[in-house]
Amino acid sequence: MRPLQAEIIKALGVQATIDPETEVRRSVDFLKAYLKKNTFLKTYVLGISGGQDSSLAGALTEKAMQEMRAETGDDAYQFIAVRLPYGEQADEADAMAAIDFMHADVVKRVNIKPSVDAMVAAVEADGSKISDFNKGNIKARMRMIAQYAIAGNNAGAVIGTDHAAEAVTGFYTKFGDGGADLTPLYRLDKRQGAALLKVLGAPAHLYEKAPTADLEDNRPALPDEVALGVKYKDIDDYLEGKDVTDQAAETIEKWYQKTAHKRHLPITVFDNFWK
């Protein structure tokens, strides 16, 4: 095993093998424990894209809320699923299928296009130009603004979908989809997340669909693997301590080092990870 590989595995808490049912219970208990400790909270809010990660996080969250209602008799415990399209979403059917699978208690829809376009126009008012990539990050951050607005109105906390295969590459928008209160998938790689969905009875297309951030107008539905230059199979193998090609390992490690700032709170004078 490569030296940095061992360090990364430890830092992200990845196990080489898992029992999916045990990990489902671990995540559900984690979500419930946070509510029991923070009794002012009554809802969890999650943006739903129709991909594997939000499908799994949503299913785990709904299960936690069902158990909280059963255990406490308090029907105020609710899971709020939020659709956050930029105008019309090409894979809207996938998102609605995910919501149907997880049986969300409440479903809301917020079209972020007017807000995103207004922000782009405001920044460009001085003659500068927002790149398509930068605009994609604005979309991700606007989605999180909407989720926190909904959470604030409903005594809620925001659920994130970050997992080990995403964390190792930093493949998320800082203070966008990377900003949340709780991340129940953290420690799981991509194939492990799919294994949890299988035991939860998810339709296969929810975990077989090619992962995409789908943030760029000029490159819609760009597959994650194309953007990263490495396949999730190799990322998962790497995180599980298996051998991968030097090229795959070097690509993963390059992303890990380049995106270290995303895995830290705002940098202070006491931090030295970046030096």
Swiss-Prot record:
Homodimer. It comes from the Bacteria. CDD domains: NAD_synthase. One of its GO terms (molecular function) is glutaminase activity. GO terms for cellular component: cytoplasm. The keyword Metal-binding applies. It catalyses: deamido-NAD(+) + NH4(+) + ATP = AMP + diphosphate + NAD(+) + H(+). Transmembrane segments: none annotated. Pathway: Cofactor biosynthesis; NAD(+) biosynthesis; NAD(+) from deamido-NAD(+) (ammonia route): step 1/1. ATP binds at G47, I48, S49, G50, G51, Q52, D53, S54, T161, K190, T212. Gene3D superfamilies: HUPs. Belongs to the NAD synthetase family. Deamido-NAD(+) binds at R141, K174, D181, H261, K262. This is NH(3)-dependent NAD(+) synthetase. Catalyzes the ATP-dependent amidation of deamido-NAD to form NAD. Uses ammonia as a nitrogen source. Its EC number is 6.3.1.5. Mg(2+) binds at D53, E166. Keywords: ATP-binding, Ligase, Magnesium, Metal-binding, NAD, Nucleotide-binding. GO terms for biological process: NAD biosynthetic process.
